[in-house]
Amino acid sequence: MAKVVIQECREYELNGLMIKINDGIERLGGWDLFVHPGDKVLLKVNLIGPKSSDSAAVTHSEFVRAVARILKQRGCEVWIGDSSGGAIGGIAPTAKSFRAAGYEKAAMEEGAVIKNFDSEGVIEVSPNSMHEEKMYLAKPIFDADVVINLPKFKTHSSCIYTGAVKNVFGCIPGLRKARYHKMAPNPESFGEILADIHQNAKFKLHIMDGVIAMQGEGPTAGDVYPANKILMSTDPLALDTAALKMLGVEVGEVAILNAAKERKIGESNLEDIIIDGDYKTIPKLDEFKLPKRYKSGKKRNNKVLIKVIDFFKTAPKVNRKKCRNCNVCVESCPMKAIDRDTKQIDYRVCIECMCCHELCMYKAVELKKENFLAGILTGIKLGKYR
């Protein structure tokens, strides 16, 4: 059976974090089961973009520092790595993101090494999905002796939730990520990409920062929520299943996790997941706001019914009053659906991946309710629905 440790932790105080994390790892078998002196240990953080740690958009720098210090005390060489989403002037903003989140400072003070996946080279792997024959993942993932996943507990405007399973998308360096969004335009097919990564990049541990979570329209434009939790497991899907239960969401309602279930990346049956730590049952997060696009599982499996019942849907729209004209949305759109000058979105080619909303650091891309009946009629006219 899979085990998920859930710890109560109310602040990013270093010693308190270390105590809770060490206790959780003991409940999973102890650090000696996972790392040894001299090991090169890569901490795969969530560094979606140049956001501060207090924004709840990235794994908090003090959370990363706590894990790094524990590993350094055990004689490990510690790397901190990721590749941010989006593009500024045709270049992924990862270097800027490491500074904005406070990782550079933490790494320097803890004797850790920053690994910018955009500039460290790639390794070719063979994915199991049918999207393409080859996939290129960041080289440090394979150079490290041990890889530990440090996801952030967040909602996602397109995928409903992002956690341990989805955090691995940052293993794809730089602007290659946009290509995969284009190849896998919906959450279910995107989940195939994530499963491919998990089957090629072997993560030993998953330690989720849920001390301060993000609710609402995550993964960057949502609101902070004091979840006061740290979740730990060797099983990414079991961890996500437990986290979703806290939100009152069934794992089957989050399509990006379907491929992980089908390929047995982990356990998704709550009856086969042991809960340990400060909690012996899964606690509920009260008044936690889910994304506007969230639908109950009763509607989820009937696409025709969704188009009739879900009369209004959310669609991205640029608020020009908030827009800084940085063009991250324009350069990050895999379908090139956003006009550089007017910031108008061509909904005829938009695949609703929400990259524009996800990667705007100024919350200028908003999700608006649209008359979906008009969209259906337009789609029929254009031959989109047959």
Feature annotation, model-predicted:
Residues M1-C326, V330-K343, Y347, I351, ...:
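N-terminal and secondary-structure boundary signal
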